[in-house]
Amino acid sequence: MTAPKKLFIKTYGCQMNVYDSERMSEALVAEGYVETKTAEDADMILLNTCHIREKAAEKVYSELGRLKSLKADNPDLKLGVAGCVAQAEGEEIMRRQPAVDLVVGPQSYHRLPQMEARLREGHKALDTDFPPEDKFEELKARPKARRAPSAFLTVQEGCDKFCAFCVVPYTRGAEVSRPVTRVLDEARDLVERGVREITLLGQNVNAYHGAGADGNEKTLAQLIWALNDIDGLERIRFTTSHPNDMQDDLIEAHRDCPKLMPYLHLPVQSGSDRILKRMNRKHTADSYLRLIERIRVGRPDILLSGDFIVGFPEETEADFQATLDLIEAVNYGYAYSFKYSTRPGTPAAERAQVDPVEADERLQRIQALITRQQQDIQQSMVGRDVSVLIEKPGRFEGQMVGKSEYLHAVHVDQCSAQIGDILPVRIVEAKRNSLAAVTLA
């Protein structure tokens, strides 16, 4: 009997890539592969890549250079590149690294079985099309194996915003939303397999406009309310959002929907109106702050996170100070900051660049402010009672680890709860990146 071939997938970048890697794995497992934890043990290696910054793309080429040596020990090893680098660079990947056998873009994952068949015939395989068929509907049904208690579920893909710094519209395409019934079917399937929390994913998820059973388009808020009715699903989150698509019904859902968690990732990128205009964000710092105020009126305890780019072309010290002022005004529980990375083909790539040393210095300053806010908010949690979804054992005997409604990592000592339980606890200590808690009687 022939031993099954082994598959190793390494995932870079966003949560949607994590979801996509799961679906690619399922497609290939259905063709007889089994997953392995190490590249050295694999018969096929897939790198699911991110192209949002230059550094991320170069990491992929560095990893390909390392992995090609494995072919000397296993001549039948197949090496593939998926994701946004694959979409953006296509056959250039094979030219730059001839050891690569397969290149597949994000819209063609459902074609992996056919591409794998070409590999078995001795050919290379390349597919970076935007095919007319829906990849979500073409992918094989998910296996019924038990899942971790938290799961991602892609409901929307692509972006029509065309921010001046971003490659997503070029690598993921125009905005597409999955039909409500398909999302609900997948959510129920996940719940049957042990999932208690689902995070809805999209490059611009609050622009969701999937068709409902009545044929009419539904908003993200309407989808969330439909998910709220699924027995066994206890928590709902969504990411990533654009301020311009934060409509009234979604703000009201944060106020009223019992299963929608009090956490919102709402990137703004800059606090300078001048830079926001150059970024093509189509909102101002003031409109963003007024939106935050409206959200907090409905849900005062909501924890906010954001994204910031420093060193965007033509950014001055005054522009940067405006960003610091906005961060101070919002008080983020989490925020992610990045130095601007030139992406070929985007409008910002042609503009005057900020001195790299100055951009590095600004990045350090913004990260110091973000860290202080995060630690202050974590410290404010001490003494509060929260609910923790238990996800895994901790490092110490009797310790379990999970996350609160606010997405804080929480360690619970002397805990008899099982993975998947939702446990009331009291926070007793704020650590650097997590909280410590005790169970409530």
Curated annotation (Swiss-Prot):
Binds 2 [4Fe-4S] clusters. One cluster is coordinated with 3 cysteines and an exchangeable S-adenosyl-L-methionine. Keywords: 4Fe-4S, Cytoplasm, Iron, Iron-sulfur, Metal-binding, S-adenosyl-L-methionine, Transferase, tRNA processing. This is tRNA-2-methylthio-N(6)-dimethylallyladenosine synthase. The keyword Transferase applies. The lineage of its organism: Bacteria, Pseudomonadati, Pseudomonadota, Alphaproteobacteria, Rhodobacterales. It catalyses: N(6)-dimethylallyladenosine(37) in tRNA + (sulfur carrier)-SH + AH2 + 2 S-adenosyl-L-methionine = 2-methylsulfanyl-N(6)-dimethylallyladenosine(37) in tRNA + (sulfur carrier)-H + 5'-deoxyadenosine + L-methionine + A + S-adenosyl-L-homocysteine + 2 H(+). The keyword ATP-binding does not apply. Catalyzes the methylthiolation of N6-(dimethylallyl)adenosine (i(6)A), leading to the formation of 2-methylthio-N6-(dimethylallyl)adenosine (ms(2)i(6)A) at position 37 in tRNAs that read codons beginning with uridine. PROSITE patterns: MTTASE_N (PS51449), MTTASE_RADICAL (PS01278), RADICAL_SAM (PS51918), TRAM (PS50926). It is an enzyme of class 2 (transferase). Its main location: cytoplasm.
